Each structure stands twice: as structure tokens, then as C-alpha cells.
Amino acid sequence: MAKKKATFICQECGYQSPKYLGRCPNCSAWSSFVEEVEVKEVKNARVSLAGEKSRPVKLKDVDNISYHRTQTDMSEFNRVLGGGVVPGSLILIGGDPGIGKSTLLLQVSTQLANKGTVLYVSGEESAEQIKLRSERLGDIDNEFYLYAETNMQAIRTEIENIKPDFLIIDSIQTIMSPDITGVQGSVSQVREVTAELMQLAKTNNIATFIVGHVTKEGTLAGPRMLEHMVDTVLYFEGERHHTFRILRAVKNRFGSTNEIGIFEMQSGGLVEVLNPSQVFLEERLDGATGSAVVVTMEGSRPILAEVQSLVTPTVFGNARRTTTGLDFNRVSLIMAVLEKRCGLLLQNQDAYLKSAGGVKLDEPAIDLAVAVAIASSYKEKPTSPQEAFLGEIGLTGEIRRVTRIEQRINEAAKLGFTKVYAPKNALQGIDIPQGIEVVGVTTVGQVLKAVFS
């Protein structure tokens, strides 16, 4: 016998309450509670992911199955997934509206259709609209099926009929299950539809991609458990006024996290950027003050990026500090060290810092480049265009070691840099390539004296 239970659920964070609340005690959102009646079947349970019947087995007796990853024609996309698409995996892709999530998945789908059957389910566009959008992407294989539907029961039926190898859901907020009360995109609908898709993906070995909307704070909309249910969480990000897009993995059960893939939006769709370091530095001005280059690591990939700074006397009572692509607290810490340990009077100076090209820099190794960029703008002295900077800055002004120092130096040498300032205690036992000088430093003051003297 079915039991009905009425619950009020916050549509912003998924907090549940037995009664209506004007303000959510969890996320402080106003007027976000919606009543949802969930019908629970007492006797029947969800089918096990292993099949109709599942029994405990010893770990040593489990067959060691080596999954064959399916490669797309985009090496950047394969890199983020950990080497390709794993059969039966559930992949969630989020991003701002208009950033190119549907375009990315449509391109990936056309490539996967050459290696298996693809079912593309859209709840936001008709089949004719998707066909019109796909014409600029090139030829499409016959094993590419379009299905404009929002009913989960109908989608399940077509999955059982077509038996696809790859399934794309665009988007999860538009799909609804008739067994669950609540409107499309509600917390209960998103949770139950995702659970059903997970069961279909695991039992039928279907690699499933799910598009998810994001909130105004930039996080994935819907219940937080959505990210826990899936195997991989990808964020597709970038400035809407820039052509570059970054695909970032924040969770991956089948590969490394913090890997990124870089794409450029063009008239024919997304084009992968195979040498992002050269792209990010090609517009750098020689002789400009307030600029420094750092070799940052994005997963296993070294990328050269430019840190820009503009330091100018303030006209306000309190100096302004603005950052784009850099952590505000990290910049404030570095400016305090420069003022205390290096004698730079920055308390009456406005400071504006950004990472050129729209890439986000958040690892400790960027500290030294940020400090040099600030000092360059403050002193009105440019850095050499062939110099790069590596190192974390401590509160006493010391330069601390960073990871993968040899890989970073090799990347700088590959792009023609002739000098790299790096932590002295991190240079022992590494092979330095020819044509580049590595200067071991111990304090920020030592670096500023060497660069600007």
C-alpha cells in the first residue's frame, strides 16, 4: 500500500521541513519552499544496480574487468575524463546559461555516433532545432538518434527499444517522472530522475551525460546529493565576452580531478586549444609594467599564464583591492608581506589584479608572480619578457617549494623563456634543460632586488 507524505522543500538547497518556512534556515533564501507530496511504496524497492538479485561476494573473488574507454576526437575532452568515456558512467556537466554546454555535448555526440549508438534526449529544444544547430558541426552518422521528450517513462521505453551505447540528457531540470509529485526542476524530481538514470546506466552499461543548470552563485542547481550520485562532475566555464572556454573536472571516479580542457568558441563550434600557454601569452606587451608570467599546474598539465597588476594612488579614504581570476585573500596576504618585509608602501594604493585570458589561478605557486607584478606596477619598472616566476610566499617573506618544479621549468624552456626564478630548496636533483637559467631564491626581497635593480 502506498503512503503519502507531504514535505516542504527548499528549491535552492534541498532543505526539507514538515511545515512552510518563509526563509530557509540552511541557505537563507526567501520564499523558496514548495510543498511536494511523495508517494512511497512500502513493499517494492528499487532494483539493485547489479541486477535483479545481488549477493555479497569476497573482494578477491570479484572479476577484474578492464573497461575499454571510448575515445572522442577531442583530446582535451578525453584528458578531462581521464582518458576517454567509461561504459556505464554517469557524467554531470554544469555551466552558466549560453556558455556552450549543449554545443559541447552535441559535438561529442556526433563523434561518439561513429563508435556506437547515441540517443540525445532534449527537453529544451525540438528535434528540428537541434538539427539546425548541428548542421554547422559537419556530417552526422546514422546511429545518432534525437528525441525531444520530458517524460521519464517515455524516455525509459525508448532506451529499452534503441539500446544506446551513449545517452545525453539536456537537461536534467526539464525531465520529470509522473510517479513523483512536483514541477519540473524541483528537488524531488531531480533526485528521482537522476536515480533512475543511474540505475539505467549501470544495469545496461550506458555512458550517460547529464546537463545541469547552475544557480546565481555558480553552483549546480538542485539537491547537493546530485553531485554525490554521479561518477563525474564537470564544470564548463569562461567569460561570455571571451571566446575561450574551460572544461574543469571537480569529481572523477575514473580519473584525476582538477584536470582542465581548453576550447575556443568559433563559428563552426568549439575548437580545442592544444597549446594554451602560447595562446595566453601571445598578446602580452613587451616593456609593460605590472606584468609577470607564472607556470601553473592544472592537474597534470603545466600552463604559462600572465598575471597583471595595476597599482595607483587612491583617491578614497580606504584603498581599493580588486581581483579577477585570483583569490582575493591570497592577494591581500601577498600585499601585506610586500609592505612589511619589502618596504613597499601599499596602504594608500589602489590595486587591481587579474589573470589574463580568463583562466583562474588558485594554487600557491602563483604567489611570487603576483608579488613581482604588484612591485612592477608600483615601481613603474617592467619585468623581462623572457622571465618566469615560481614559488609560494610565506608570511615571513620566504619563498617555499612548489610541486612538479622540473615539469614547470621544462614548459617554460619549451616556450622560449631564458630565466626562471624558483625556490632554491626545490632545485636539488632536477635536470635543467639547456638554454634556460634557473635562479634559486629564498626571499621575496631577494627576487625584487634581482629583477628591478
Curated annotation (Swiss-Prot):
InterPro entries: AAA+_ATPase, DNA_repair_RadA, P-loop_NTPase, RecA_ATP-bd, Ribosomal_Su5_D2-typ_SF, Ribsml_uS5_D2-typ_fold_subgr, Rubredoxin_2
Keywords associated with the record: ATP-binding, DNA damage, DNA repair, DNA-binding, Hydrolase, Metal-binding, Nucleotide-binding, Stress response, Zinc, Zinc-finger
GO function terms (MF aspect): ATP binding; ATP hydrolysis activity; ATP-dependent DNA damage sensor activity; damaged DNA binding; zinc ion binding
SMART domains on file: AAA
Region annotation Lon-protease-like: where it falls in the sequence: 350-453
GO cellular component: cytosol
Zinc finger (C4-type) in chain: 10-27
PROSITE patterns tied to this protein: RECA_2
Annotated motif RadA KNRFG motif, positions: 251-255
Pfam families (UniProt xref): AAA_25 (PF13481), ChlI (PF13541), Zn_ribbon_LapB (PF18073)
EC number: 3.6.4.-
Annotated positions binding ATP: G95, D96, P97, G98, I99, G100, K101, S102
Gene Ontology biological process terms from the UniProt entry: recombinational repair
Enzyme superclass (EC): hydrolase
PANTHER family assigned to the protein according to its UniProt record, in alphabetical order: DNA REPAIR PROTEIN RADA (PTHR32472), DNA REPAIR PROTEIN RADA-LIKE PROTEIN (PTHR32472:SF10)
Domain notes: Has a putative N-terminal zinc-finger, a middle region with homology to RecA with ATPase motifs including the RadA KNRFG motif, while the C-terminus is homologous to Lon protease.
Family membership noted in the UniProt record: Belongs to the RecA family. RadA subfamily.
Function: DNA-dependent ATPase involved in processing of recombination intermediates, plays a role in repairing DNA breaks. Stimulates the branch migration of RecA-mediated strand transfer reactions, allowing the 3' invading strand to extend heteroduplex DNA faster. Binds ssDNA in the presence of ADP but not other nucleotides, has ATPase activity that is stimulated by ssDNA and various branched DNA structures, but inhibited by SSB. Does not have RecA's homology-searching function.
Protein name listed in UniProt: DNA repair protein RadA
Origin species: Streptococcus pyogenes serotype M6 (strain ATCC BAA-946 / MGAS10394)
